[in-house]
Regions:
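C-terminal effector/interaction modules appended to NTPase cores
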Residues: 1, 11, 19-25, 201-404
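Conserved G1/Walker A P-loop phosphate-binding module
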Residues: 1-78, 86-89
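Short, flexible loop segments at the rims of nucleotide/cofactor-binding pockets, characterized by
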Residues: 41, 70-76, 99-103, 167-169, ...
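Conserved C-terminal guanine-recognition region of P-loop GTPase G domains, centered on the G4
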Residues: 52-60, 79-147, 177-180, 203-219, ...
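G-domain G4 guanine-recognition motif of GTPases
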Residues: 67, 98-102, 120-136, 147-156, ...
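Canonical P-loop GTPase G-domain recognition
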Residues: 120-180, 187-189, 218-227, 264-265, ...
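Long, well-ordered amphipathic alpha-helical subdomains in the mid-to-C-terminal portions
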Residues: 181-209
């Protein structure tokens, strides 16, 4: 994706579900006005979920997800069906595609039950409908809004776009990343280490998003490396309102920054933005109970190239061993992979999830809670290990109560 484009994690995720040859790929091409998806009469053309980042009016920036048919057969087919079902965990709006010449069957209704169980907004779209169709009876049977469209002639495609736009969740009351922590005219200092793990020639996504959030709030953002932090603070005429740092230099930054200046990290901001900061604060207490052999799952939302000083696979495990004095067994997941059975783990430590949308991160937290496994966040864990958790939560008075 273009680095100037809306991040995929910030786009409305629209999942297209249905049986093989129901017309899912043709519908995607019609909605987007482009030949993005391969269309064939051969069943099972789409073998894995395919993601298409688009700008579609009146929806705005979206991520269209074309999924394998839910009626795929055989051992490999069952794996494809499972992948299609997993897409529900990151879907904001679902489209159930039904061939109008066949009508819905038990597989369609079973999938619809899964969708409604997750409380997702959904439209049942009957494809291959060249003439007007009365779907009143189907709406009664399925219990959801139904629309008849033709991907060939474009019939009702514009109306479908409008209907989808009406289902977009209201963002007015959603959690801000950083804008609610500053006032217009405030100064914020961002501490960004440039080490071997840092991408060449650019800032990573969390840093970009925090800078934009500060600018949108009318604040001034200063960006510095940890090595230049002291000189940066000395150059400012007044103390900054807040310091936001990379978690891996928490210890140094906490010693350098005056105690009357708010301090937190990019990772903690994202735990509040996409996850559940209260749950992360509760979960981190498990660190003091870790013993030899306890399994700890470290999970990341992206699949970046591992460096010799990688935070997830090298630094964090080393800090945990030193803090606990124990030898736990670490396991890792990355990208879209996330263990279904979490009961074997003593705790889970998750990254800030800048590459995951809120829906998927909330699903992971829910899985951990439902299975009774404490889950926390990189930034929270590192602050806890450094003995500065209370200080890093000062910007969030409601969260501080969890430490009482």
């Amino acid at each position: 994706m273009d680095l100037n484009a809306t991040p995929s994690s910030e786009r409305i995720h629209i999942g297209i579900f249905g049986k093989r040859n129901a017309g899912k790929s043709s519908l995607i091409n019609a909605i987007t006005g482009q030949n993005l998806a391969i269309v064939s009469d051969t069943k099972g053309t789409t073998t894995d979920p395919v993601y298409k980042a688009m700008e579609i009016l009146p929806l705005g920036p979206v991520m269209i997800i074309d999924t394998p048919g839910i009626d795929d057969e055989g051992e490999l087919g069952a794996q494809r069906v499972q992948k299609a079902v997993q897409v529900l965990n990151k879907t904001d709006i679902a489209i159930l595609v039904i061939d109008s010449t066949l009508g819905p069957d038990k597989e369609d209704t079973a999938l619809l039950a899964r969708i409604t169980e997750k409380k997702l907004p959904v439209i049942a779209v009957f494809t291959k409908a060249e003439a007007a169709a009365d779907l009143t009876n189907y709406e009664k049977i399925l219990g959801v809004k139904c629309m008849a469209v033709s991907s060939v002639s474009g019939r009702n495609i514009a109306e479908l776009r409008t209907a989808l736009a009406a289902l977009v969740p209201d963002k007015k009351s959603t959690q801000q990343l950083v804008g609610d922590l500053v006032n217009p005219g405030d100064t914020a200092v961002l501490v960004v280490p440039v080490d071997s793990a840092a991408p060449k020639g650019r800032l990573i996504l969390p840093q970009q998003q925090v800078i934009r959030g500060l600018l949108d709030a009318g604040a001034t953002a200063f960006v510095t490396q940890d090595k230049q932090l002291e000189s940066c603070l000395d150059a400012l005429k007044e103390k900054p309102k807040i310091i936001i740092t990379d978690s891996q230099v928490f210890g140094f930054v906490a010693k350098t920054v005056p105690n009357d200046v708010l301090l937190t990290s990019f990772s903690i901001l994202f735990a509040r933005y996409k996850g559940d900061l209260k749950e992360a604060v509760r979960g981190v207490n498990m660190l003091k109970h870790i013993k030899n052999g306890d399994r700890i799952l470290i999970s990341e939302g992206c699949t970046h190239h591992r460096q010799c000083d990688d935070i997830g696979t090298v630094k964090l495990p080393a800090w945990i061993k030193k803090f606990t004095g124990a030898e736990p067994a670490f396991e890792w997941t990355s990208g879209t992979a996330f263990a279904e059975d979490l009961t074997k783990y003593k705790m889970i430590i998750h990254c800030g999830a800048c590459m995951l949308n809120e829906k998927e991160m909330q699903h992971r937290i829910s899985c951990a809670k439902n299975q009774g496994v404490p889950i926390t966040n990189y930034g929270i864990a590192i602050a806890y290990i450094n003995g500065i958790l209370r200080r890093t939560l000062q910007p969030f008075p409601d969260i501080l109560k969890e430490l009482e």
